[in-house]
Amino acid sequence: MIELPWPPSSLSGHAKGNWHGKAGVTAKHRVWAKAATLAARSMIVVPETGDIRVHVMFYPPSRRGDRVNYPNLMKPYWDGIADALHVNDSRFLPSYGFGEPVKDGKVVVTVG
């Protein structure tokens, strides 16, 4: 299980603004995802070929968000997890769940 901080709205594909301002935030979240995955690596079994099932539970910081858009915030996390597992993120077969809001929000990823 990989626990990550709630991603900011600036990571959304719909976010406005210059790409340069978004690049630092994207890189930071990718590094967090890689570090968290490496910490949990001993509990993760990755098949040699084929799809890798990944379940994501979103625990938003409040009820204000739009659950349809939460998966759009995940790209830097997918990249960081893929880096740590040495796989292409196109192999991920994601499923999503939505929990009750928690303070500051979090994303919990289960691989396998």
Which role does the model predict for each range below?
Residues 1-112:
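Catalytic phosphate/metal-binding cores of nucleic-acid and nucleotide-processing enzymes, i.e., regions
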